[in-house]
């Protein structure tokens, strides 16, 4: 599987063996009112457990985890 990953820049990379899901996790930090939600993209073996105030989406096809604002 290939997933978009966040870091210094957003890139699409092949996932490590055993990590066959892509995920997008969003949450608010102190700048949420001016910058919007923090977005984290990457690969995972299982969909992460949602914590309070987080939103997580998982999917299993190549590059299925983009956020609409990142593709503009």
Swiss-Prot record:
Its main location: secreted. Disulfide bonds join 3-22, 15-43, 28-32, 47-58, 59-64. One of its GO terms (molecular function) is ion channel regulator activity. Keywords: Acetylcholine receptor inhibiting toxin, Disulfide bond, Ion channel impairing toxin, Neurotoxin, Postsynaptic neurotoxin, Secreted, Toxin. InterPro entries: Snake_3FTx, Snake_toxin-like_sf, Snake_toxin_con_site, Toxin_cobra-type. Expressed by the venom gland. GO terms for cellular component: extracellular region. Binds with high affinity to muscular (alpha-1/CHRNA1) and neuronal (alpha-7/CHRNA7) nicotinic acetylcholine receptor (nAChR) and inhibits acetylcholine from binding to the receptor, thereby impairing neuromuscular and neuronal transmission. This is Long neurotoxin OH-5.
